[in-house]
């Protein structure tokens, strides 16, 4: 029997925190009409959908840390997070569809990249939603302990508010040091 998993990552463009990926094998009972790319779903609905997907699928989340991102670059870190999510699945899929144009290096897996897969393939859309909700929860926790950066609203992306806060407060251990404009700022708080 063919078992397909969808995989997507979130947080590549953020200036802070880990990059997250999720792998999802949908149950046949799930209503795929509800599944869309996480960027197209309102936050409150995204959280409800994440819970619905988790109850009606086999899923796993993987991540790559800020240190890993700075050491191996964001593309390789994204692929590493995907690899970790795939390997954490409780069931090995016979096919894995990955959003984008690159696939992680995984032997003994049938991997296929699908450009804009998060908009075309329900299992990739589901992975997008789970990864986004998981990362957003983590970043919201970071925001409570790192006041002043507005991470609870900008989630670490390079908004005017965030860049202004960096100029005032400096960068800290959660910032990706190799990312522009972070690499241009002197560290105050590390």
Label each PLM-derived region with a short phrase.
Residues 1-190:
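RNase H-like, Mg2+-dependent phosphodiesterase core
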């Amino acid at each position: 029997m063919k078992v397909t998993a969808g995989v997507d990552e979130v947080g590549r463009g953020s200036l802070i925190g880990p990059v997250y990926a999720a792998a999802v094998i949908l149950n046949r009972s799930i209503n795929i009409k509800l599944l869309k790319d996480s960027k197209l779903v309102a936050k409150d609905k995204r959280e409800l959908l994440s819970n619905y997907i988790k109850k009606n699928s086999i899923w796993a989340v993987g991540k790559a840390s800020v240190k890993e991102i700075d050491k191996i670059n964001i593309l390789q870190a994204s692929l590493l997070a995907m690899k970790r999510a795939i390997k954490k699945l409780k069931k090995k899929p016979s096919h894995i569809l990955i959003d984008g144009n690159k696939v992680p290096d995984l032997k003994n897996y049938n991997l296929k990249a699908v450009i804009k897969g998060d908009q075309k393939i329900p299992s990739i859309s589901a992975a997008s939603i789970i990864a986004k909700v998981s990362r957003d929860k983590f970043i919201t926790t970071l925001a409570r302990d790192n006041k002043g950066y507005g991470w609870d609203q900008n989630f670490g992306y390079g908004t005017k508010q965030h860049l202004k806060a960096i100029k005032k407060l400096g960068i800290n251990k959660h910032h990706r040091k190799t990312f522009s404009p972070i690499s241009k700022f002197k560290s105050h708080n590390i």
